[in-house]
Amino acid sequence: MENLFVYGTLLDPKVRRRIFGISLDGCWDALPGYKKEEGIVAGTYPGIMPSDPERSEVAGLLFSLPSEILARVDTYEGSLYYRKTLNLRSGKSAWVYLPAENQIR
């Protein structure tokens, strides 16, 4: 199983069900040292950027997914984002999608 932290369009249960192919419950967590910005990816989608670790964090949901579902999320995110392992406030590490540099507007 793979940990995935989501903070944008995948917070919407309808979008998650369409991408994951099943209904899954996540748990709330946060990513310290980042800030969320709306519309910075391709001028439309949210993204997160490094920020002051003492004052900034991004709230989101943490899911434990089979690798097959994570591969579907990779396809959904496409070339707009890349996946990186980061540490969450809970102490768990998870994959997080960060904006691809060439997509930031």
Each language-model region and where it sits:
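Glycine-aromatic micro-motifs
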Residues: 1-105
